[in-house]
Amino acid sequence: MEIETATIATPHKGRPREFCVDMALAAALRVFWSKGYEGASMADLTEAMGITKPSLYAAFGNKEALFNKALDLYEREKADYMHAALDAPTARGVAERLMYGALDMYTCPENPNGCLGVITSVACGAEAECIRQAVLERGAAAKRAMLARFARAKEEGDFPPDTDAEGLAAFLTAVNQGMSVQAGAGATRAELERLVETSLKLWPGR
């Protein structure tokens, strides 16, 4: 795998020092995930990434651009279970994979607690409205994909005829967002797992 590097400008004479862009971006992701977009200061980011502010701007653009790159990384590496869940053979399997995938991510000791998207959309103020809207649009796209999968399941007879596919997509979204908030507040894995199990007992169809 090719590792992308960038050069840090230094105030002293001599050869500029290179840094790994991927590692710096992963460090930035952890800061945003822990503190939210507005809570993450440039000092927090540059310290965690091990680079100077000019080097951050040169490699990633401004703070907003850095956050969007970190969010892309988050979706690729942390929230990839969402795409895999839609390939489950049944709608119940989709729900199970989505909720347990979220549970695993929210409670993994290597990750900050909760969901980056939920943390950011809740914590952003008026000055970061563009970031909030971008995060909400990604969430809406995920919900649309879920709704399309459930509509197909209904056509295939996987649900009772009177099932509200849109309501189920909203229900799953609310459960996962609720787990994120509870994980951020210190809920244990056992407590969240009980929520998942109860939700699956309420699930219609097979």
What are these regions (language model features)?
Residues 4, 113-119, 163-182, 194-202:
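Hydrophobic alpha-helical segments that form the core
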Residues 72-78:
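Short, basic, alpha-helical segments at the C-terminal edge of helix-turn-helix-like DNA-binding modules
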Residues 95, 109-130:
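Amphipathic alpha-helical segments used for helix-helix packing
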Residues 105-108, 152, 172-189, 202-206:
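Amphipathic C-terminal alpha-helical segment
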Residues 2, 23, 27, 31-65, ...:
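Helix-turn-helix
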Residues 1-19, 162:
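N-terminal intrinsically disordered/low-complexity leader segments
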Residues 69, 83-113, 165-172:
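Hydrophobic alpha-helical connector segments
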Residues 79, 129-156, 167, 194:
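Amphipathic alpha-helical packing segments from all-alpha helical-bundle domains
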